[in-house]
Every structure is written in C-alpha cells, then in structure tokens.
Swiss-Prot record:
GO MF annotation list: ATP binding; ATP hydrolysis activity; ATPase-coupled transmembrane transporter activity
The protein's enzyme class: translocase
Superkingdom, natural source: Bacteria
Keywords of this entry: ATP-binding, Cell membrane, Membrane, Nucleotide-binding, Translocase, Transport
EC numbers on record: 7.-.-.-
Organismal lineage: Bacteria, Bacillati, Bacillota, Bacilli, Lactobacillales
Domain ABC transporter per the UniProt entry, residue ranges: 3-245
Designated gene of the protein: ecfA2
Keyword Transmembrane helix: no
Protein's recorded name: Energy-coupling factor transporter ATP-binding protein EcfA2
NCBIfam families: ECF_ATPase_2
Length: 285
C-alpha cells in the first residue's frame, strides 16, 4: 500500500494566535514495498512528517491516504485504531519506552493491546524477537539488563509483533556503535524482504545509501526533492549547501579528488565504487 500526502499543511496550535506552521504544502508519494529515507537538516520537519503516518498528528489542512484509510484534521481518535494496527512506529531511542519485567512480556504488550489472545501474542512476540535476532536466552531477562543494541532490537520487536504492514523508524541507528548500526541496517533490509514498506529518518547519508530505494528531502517544512539515492546524491554541490546536507563519504572524497584534478565520470555513492573508478583512471593514464 502506497502512502500519499495530498496538500498537507500542519501547524501546532492551529487556529490560535500562537499557531506555529511546521509543514507546508506537502505533496509526495511513499511507494509500496520499498525503503524510503527521509533526510534533511534538524528542524526541517522530518519528525512531524512521520507522525502523520499513524495519526499521532493530523493534517491541519489536506489529507494523508494510506490504502483505503484517509487521515484528515476532523478524524476522531477512536477511528485511528485500524491505522495504528497497520503502521508501526519506532521512535528515536525506543529503548526508553521499555517497561516490562521481561523481554518477552515487553514485546507481547502491543499484540495484546490490539486484541490478540495471550497465546497468540506470545507466539507473535517470539516470532518478532527472532526476526530482529534477539536470542532465546534473553527472552526471560529484564530488558534493562541488555546492551544498548539489544534493547534497541527488543523495542523494534515490540512494534513488529503486531505485524504492521508499514514500519516507521525515527533515527533507528542513533547512539549505536558501528556493530549495532550494521545489525540495525540488516534488520531494515530484512523488513523489506519480508514485504514491509519501511520509512526511516536518518542524518547518516551512508546509511541512506546502504538501505534506501527512495529518498525524500525536506527543508524548512517542505519537500524539496525526491528520487532514488543516485538521483539525489548526484545533485550539484550548491544544492547540498542550500539544504544543509552532507554527501555520503564516497561523494565527499570524490569531490576532494576532483579539486585535485582527478576526472570522475560521476559522483560515486560507495567507497568501493570510488576505488573502482580510481583504478580505471589509473589504467587509462
């Protein structure tokens, strides 16, 4: 199921003298079956944008269409249950939301909340824990005894246990060490392979390159570009300065080499790609 934002505007305190406009005239489609990265400088509206995906926020004007569900400003809270069953949200530092006595009990909470019988909730929780590579020996431990990376995976399992079609991740790799980041990106790839639509916010462009099929760029509350990683990261340097974004590491190195006289046919996205281009350049000298 694709997600369509149609003429979406959002203001905190809408209709008051203290209204604070955040999102402006958002018209964008998040394609089904892909991993979409939302990027942009701090304060560009990314978190506000994704909170419209499961009705934590509702458009001040316009609408968000997810399959047959239409989110508008006048939708009642009681009508959001079906949307939230379809759209799972994992917030930044989700381990702060862990609360139960054991890992398994924590992950069972969401499916029970959505009406699963206890036995079904336990099966769903165990399936989700396996999906994010949390070993069985940890299931009966307190989640607060785990490492940061393990806690992050348990929190993700809590969202996956109710089997949503859409997974939304706010800075999923924030605060993790390199090993934890690598494991997290592997989980994102696995979610796509399982047929999920994945949306994630990231400030790390190399993570975007590693897993995203589709990229949405936000700046000052609006969508200023969208496309494949190749399309986005081959825009000119002036544009990147305008939207206050960095290039991936390979792109940064490539620009430094260009300034030193190297001729590269395009801006590489991966360091391995850059190495190949330099080897080709050397062979033609």
């Amino acid at each position: 199921m694709a997600i369509n934002f149609e003429q979406v505007n959002f203001s905190y305190g809408a209709g008051t003298t203290l209204a604070q406009p955040i999102l402006h005239d958002i018209n964008v489609t998040i394609p089904d079956g892909q991993v979409t990265a939302i990027i942009g400088q701090t304060g560009s509206g990314k978190s506000t944008f994704i909170q419209h995906l499961n009705g934590l926020l509702k458009p001040t004007t316009g609408r968000v269409v997810i399959d047959d569900f239409v989110l508008t400003s006048d939708l009642k809270e009681k009508n959001l249950t079906s949307l939230r069953a379809r759209v799972g949200m994992v917030f930044q530092f989700p381990e702060n939301q862990l609360f139960a006595n054991t890992v398994l009990e924590d992950v069972m909470y969401a499916p029970i909340n959505f009406g699963y019988a206890k036995a079904d909730a336990e099966f769903a929780a165990k399936t989700a824990l396996k999906q994010v590579n949390v070993s069985e020996e940890l299931w009966d431990k307190s989640p607060f005894e785990l490492s940061g990376g393990q806690m992050r995976r348990v929190a993700m399992a809590g969202t996956l246990a109710s089997n949503p079609d859409i997974i939304v991740l706010d800075e999923p790799a924030a605060g993790l060490d390199p090993k934890g980041q690598k494991e997290l990106l592997a989980i994102v790839r696995g979610l796509k392979e399982a047929g999920k639509l994945v949306v994630f916010i990231s400030h790390q462009m190399d993570h975007v390159i590693a897993v995203a099929d589709h990229v949405i760029v936000m700046h000052d509350g609006g969508v200023v570009a969208e496309g494949t990683p190749v399309e986005i990261f081959n825009k000119d340097l002036v544009w990147f300065k305008t939207v206050a974004l960095d290039l991936p590491k390979a792109g940064q190195f490539a620009e430094q080499l260009r300034q030193k006289g190297h001729i590269l046919r395009h801006r590489p996205l991966l360091l391995t790609e850059l190495a190949t281009m330099l080897n080709e350049e050397k062979r033609h000298e």
